[in-house]
Amino acid sequence: MTNQTIKVVIAGARGRMGIEAVKLAEETSHFELVAALDHAHEGKKLSDVIHTTSEAPIYTDIDVCLSETAPDVLIDLTTPEIGKVHTKKALEHGVRPVVGTTGFSEADLKELQQLTEEKGIGCIIAPNFAVGAVLMMKFAKMAANYFPDVEIIELHHDKKLDAPSGTGLKTAEMIAEVRESKKQGHPDEKELIEGARGADYDGIRLHSVRLPGMIAHQEVLFGMDGQTLTIRHDSYNRASFMSGVKLSVEQVMHIDQLVYGLENIID
């Protein structure tokens, strides 16, 4: 916890995650919501477009927004392509980004790391802000030391645009760090329908499910002779992500580098 007032701008404040982030900013005494970034509604107040008491102005131009409001932190909850632009712009303005969008390549991350070093400020990119999901990934990495046979099933609402999810991909990356590369399944298996065995990350199979009624869920299934281990996390609403957003906003004020993944700021 910090007593310092942290001035924040929220990009994507009218989205499902953004609305929860606005509530978080309103309910956190040391957060001050100074503006929102949106593709429309320039010059209006947040209270004009969503159910909130916030009078924060809405901007459509990120450069103007950051210059006029001088925030400490940009919370970006937009789309992968917009998020990439916003993250770079924020760093160029000396504003610390906390990013909940996915789709950053290794080249993107390298460029952002260089920017954080040049500016001497932090940046946190989190494929998943739910603390339970982060612990699931950490537990999966631990289990992979003993269970090399593993598959991942991630399940999300049918409005999600990317597959696999950032959490699913990040889980596979973490497991691959400790697991010897191995193609999962029978070496001679054949897919009767292309894609039936899911995506392949270093031999780890990832399966993506998209259905209405779901929010964000993931199972990591391990198997060996005579036993299986399942590690599962479920987010039943988007409020579940706000503890991670709050932690990230507080922590980004005290770091001077790029952090990819909430697991790197949770002991």
From Swiss-Prot:
(S)-2,3,4,5-tetrahydrodipicolinate binds at residues 157, 166-167. Keywords: Amino-acid biosynthesis, Cytoplasm, Diaminopimelate biosynthesis, Lysine biosynthesis, NAD, NADP, Oxidoreductase. GO terms for molecular function: 4-hydroxy-tetrahydrodipicolinate reductase; NAD binding; NADP binding; oxidoreductase activity, acting on CH or CH2 groups, NAD or NADP as acceptor. GO terms for cellular component: cytosol. Pathway: Amino-acid biosynthesis; L-lysine biosynthesis via DAP pathway; (S)-tetrahydrodipicolinate from L-aspartate: step 4/4. It is found in: Cytoplasm. It catalyses: (S)-2,3,4,5-tetrahydrodipicolinate + NAD(+) + H2O = (2S,4S)-4-hydroxy-2,3,4,5-tetrahydrodipicolinate + NADH + H(+); (S)-2,3,4,5-tetrahydrodipicolinate + NADP(+) + H2O = (2S,4S)-4-hydroxy-2,3,4,5-tetrahydrodipicolinate + NADPH + H(+). NAD(+) binds at residues 12-17, 38, 100-102, 126-129. The active site is at residues 156, 160. InterPro entries: DapB_C, DapB_N, DapB_N_CS, DHDPR_bac, NAD(P)-bd_dom_sf. Transmembrane segments: none annotated. Its main location: cytoplasm. Its EC number is 1.17.1.8. CDD domains: DHDPR_N. Catalyzes the conversion of 4-hydroxy-tetrahydrodipicolinate (HTPA) to tetrahydrodipicolinate. Belongs to the DapB family. This is 4-hydroxy-tetrahydrodipicolinate reductase. The gene is dapB.
